[in-house]
């Protein structure tokens, strides 16, 4: 086949294929153009998720007839010149997006320059038939895209259902809206308003907070830590959720570089590392994080759609983001999710009925078979009258008891005022500690709470010094289910030795343990080794030391902690609560589950209609 030049329309269609994948891609390019045009209001109208019609209207600076004619040509832009190539502050090349979109659709652009007398219009079908005419329009630009991909039917076949395509477009608009809280946005689909976001004109932090509430929700802000971190070349701000407020996917993670939404692996890994002590591997935090970086230190042109970026010093950026998130979480370390208490109160209002074990009968306190009956006056009158001395002793003892009770009540009142988690009042099902504060009831999971305390304590030991080893009087032989698990533990024996565990191979499937960390006390060695083997066998020999330490610390903490089912005295319960108040990140266990929930008195009173 003879080599030949491609036609201009074919070149444009190929270029469009790199950038324009679906209606959401068109909306992204055109809305970013509107942002770059200094717009304060951007309206988006869609029909059939954008397959039939996309209209983007803005009140930006607009274009003259000459600019309009040039804007739809390839390799033209109003956004920068050659000297700015390493210092890009805009979101795209107006002269790149428009011809690419025009090549695969029927496009109509109407625009009026600010303070101009006339508006102009240009119409293109498949990128051809370019003709500028005089029109009527307000200041700004309106772009209509009809019959997207009509010129590339193969691409049209691969579009998803309207619902899926619409969700992608809504996601794009939300991301851009988060980055520009001063701009008003509206999104209408098939005549139905889906988004209406009012532009904010207060200080930057207030603007961002309100836009996040409008886009992500008020619950997120209530359960999020504010990030404010600065260096000479970087600044990081935004909100990231408390570990107990998490999701099953990373869909609600909004990351921005110089106000540009990105889905960058480096940033996602940094986010995962920052939360690795607080969340299970299958749970994800929610965040809206904005990194402002010297444009010369980041390349945004790595990907045609600019979804990925390249940093001059990626490790430095990664470490800064981890530090910024951890600092923010530390400041919110004792707080558990506010929605957990709300969910608990909803369960009180609408209790779940267990159909497997229905209540067999209702006990009537007046029936003969009742287990409890109120004491009658006749019973009280049966006290013998001839024990005068005993009565005197009882009275004196009673006075002493009353004084002790009063002292204890006064002490508890001080605790309720002074401490966030209040004074322990009871232990429920030998698993949950019930405590009282000035205006709430706190329910604490004793195992989850103590596990968190143990995790932080062991982690501190591992950072500052080697764990003190405790030699077993009689070495423990642990038989594992298979040779693979035994080999895995043995392969890591040198690393485990530094973590306080001394072991040797004993036969094909067994391990002999001679020393354990002193901090674990009287631990079940069999269970400890089996749990460690389960954790590590999935990773084999190639597990990194940091990851190994994470797994070992988690296993140690689990065996160190108070188990559910253990009865605690009032002093032990209060001691646990005080330790929680003095330990960072005690509001959740290291899987992101809450260690306590707080039920406000006003909410409890509402349950009773008070």
Swiss-Prot record:
Gene3D superfamilies: 3.30.230.10, Histidine kinase-like ATPase, C-terminal domain, MutL, C-terminal domain, dimerisation subdomain, MutL, C-terminal domain, regulatory subdomain
CDD domains, alphabetized: HATPase_MutL-MLH-PMS-like, MutL_Trans
Pfam families recorded: DNA_mis_repair, HATPase_c_3, MutL_C
SMART domains documented for this protein: DNA_mis_repair, MutL_C
Record carries keyword DNA damage: yes
Top-level taxon: Bacteria
GO molecular function annotations of the record: ATP binding; ATP hydrolysis activity; ATP-dependent DNA damage sensor activity; mismatched DNA binding
Annotated family: Belongs to the DNA mismatch repair MutL/HexB family.
HAMAP family registered for this protein in UniProt: DNA_mis_repair (MF_00149)
Name this protein carries in UniProt: DNA mismatch repair protein MutL
Gene source species: Rickettsia rickettsii (strain Sheila Smith)
Originating gene: mutL
């Amino acid at each position: 086949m003879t080599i030949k030049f491609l036609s201009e329309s074919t070149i444009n269609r190929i270029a469009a294929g790199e950038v324009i994948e679906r209606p959401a891609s068109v909306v992204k390019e055109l809305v970013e153009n509107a942002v770059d045009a200094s717009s304060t209001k951007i309206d988006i109208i869609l029909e059939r998720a954008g397959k039939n019609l996309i209209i983007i209207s803005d009140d930006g600076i607009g274009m003259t007839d000459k600019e309009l004619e040039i804007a739809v040509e390839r390799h033209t832009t109003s956004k920068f010149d050659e000297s700015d190539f390493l210092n890009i502050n805009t979101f795209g090349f107006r002269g790149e997006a428009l011809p690419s979109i025009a090549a695969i659709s029927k496009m109509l652009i109407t625009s009026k320059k600010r303070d101009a007398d006339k508006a102009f219009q240009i119409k293109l079908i498949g990128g051809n038939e370019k003709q500028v005419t005089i029109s009527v329009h307000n200041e700004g630009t309106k772009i209509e895209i009809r019959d997207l991909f009509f010129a590339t039917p193969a691409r049209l076949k691969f579009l998803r259902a309207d619902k899926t395509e619409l969700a992608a477009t809504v996601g794009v608009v939300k991301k851009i809206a988060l980055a520009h809280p001063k701009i008003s946005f509206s999104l209408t689909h098939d005549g139905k308003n889906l988004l209406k976001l009012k532009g904010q004109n207060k200080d930057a932090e207030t603007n961002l907070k309100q836009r996040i509430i409008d886009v992500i929700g008020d619950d997120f802000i209530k359960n999020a830590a504010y990030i404010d971190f600065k260096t000479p070349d970087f600044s990081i701000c935004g909100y990231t959720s408390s570990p107990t407020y998490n999701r099953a996917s990373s869909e609600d993670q909004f990351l921005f570089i110089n106000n540009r939404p990105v889905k960058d692996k480096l940033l996602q890994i940094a986010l995962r590392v920052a939360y690795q002590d607080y969340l299970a591997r299958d749970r994800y935090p929610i965040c809206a994080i904005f990194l402002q970086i010297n444009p010369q230190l980041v390349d945004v042109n790595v990907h045609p759609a600019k979804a990925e970026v390249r940093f001059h010093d990626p490790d430095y950026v990664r470490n800064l983001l981890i530090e910024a998130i951890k600092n923010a979480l530390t400041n919110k370390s004792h707080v558990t999710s506010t929605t957990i208490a709300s969910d608990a109160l909803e369960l009180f209002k609408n209790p779940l009925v267990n159909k497997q074990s229905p209540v067999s009968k209702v006990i009537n306190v007046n029936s003969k078979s009742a287990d409890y009956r109120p004491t009658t006056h006749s019973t009280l009158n049966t006290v013998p009258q001839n024990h005068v001395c005993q009565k005197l002793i009882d009275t004196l003892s009673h006075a002493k008891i009353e004084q002790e009770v009063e002292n204890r009540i006064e002490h508890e009142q001080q605790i309720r005022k002074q401490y966030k988690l209040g004074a322990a009042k009871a232990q429920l099902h030998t698993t949950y500690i019930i405590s009282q504060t000035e205006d709430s009831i706190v329910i604490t999971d004793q195992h989850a709470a103590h596990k968190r305390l143990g995790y932080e304590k062991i982690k501190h030991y591992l950072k500052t010094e080697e764990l003190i080893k405790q030699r077993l009087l009689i070495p423990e032989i642990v038989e594992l289910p298979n040779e693979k698990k035994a080999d895995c533990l043995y392969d890591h024996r040198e690393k485990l030795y530094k973590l306080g565990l001394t072991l040797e191979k004993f036969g094909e499937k067994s391990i002999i343990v001679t020393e354990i960390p002193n901090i674990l006390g009287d631990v079940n060695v069999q269970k400890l080794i089996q749990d460690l083997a389960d954790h590590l066998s999935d990773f084999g020999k190639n597990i990194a030391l940091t990851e190994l330490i994470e797994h070992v610390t988690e296993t140690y903490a689990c065996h160190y902690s108070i188990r559910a089912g253990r009865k605690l005295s009032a002093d032990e319960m209060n001691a646990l609560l005080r330790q929680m108040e003095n330990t960072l990140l005690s509001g959740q266990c290291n899987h992101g589950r809450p260690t306590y929930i707080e039920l406000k008195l006003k909410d409890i009173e509402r349950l009773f209609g008070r």
